[in-house]
């Protein structure tokens, strides 16, 4: 009986020893995997940043960068209706594009500005359900004007779409901006708008 007790004690020690090792491994393994995953991710990010090209942008693009930030204001339409507007501009895609999130009367849209063959252009993802493209038509020290670019396939006299846009911004008054735009209807009549915005600090 004494011998059996000793054997049983050894067996228990061996058993619990194994269980303890298993518990330790269960705790250590996830930690090691987490460390490995983080090391891999950071390594990839580091190498990715090292491989990214230096983006060259147009003068118009650099001018547009001046309005990066959040803005709020009112839009007055040609029919007299006044709408609340919020918008935010961000530099994205390694400095190669500028996104604009626009909320008009609670409806959200997005416009992406970027250089195409050295000329600033834009794609406007509209609540009308289409995506008109615009291209820079004129630039001054305080304004950028865009006209419709038919490359998107929309056609005047057939479709209703946003077809003109102007951003007026004077760096000497960095917290004020005026934007105008037009939407052309299927019958070629035009709805115009003027938006006065203040920078949100």
Residue ranges and their predicted role:
Residues 67-72, 93-100, 118-123, 141-147, ...:
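Short, hydrophobic/aromatic-rich segments at coil-to-beta transitions
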Residues 45, 176-201:
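Edge beta-strand at a domain terminus
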Residues 106-137:
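Helix-adjacent hinge/juxtasegments
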Residues 1-4, 11-46:
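Bacterial Sec-dependent N-terminal signal peptides
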Residues 136-173, 180-185:
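Short aromatic loop motif centered on NTY/YTY
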Residues 55-70:
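N-terminal helix-cap/turn-to-beta initiation motif at the start of protein domains
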Residues 82-109:
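N-terminal mature ectodomain segment of secretory-pathway/periplasmic proteins
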Residues 75-78, 101-104, 124-127, 148-152, ...:
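Beta-turn initiation residues at beta-strand->coil junctions
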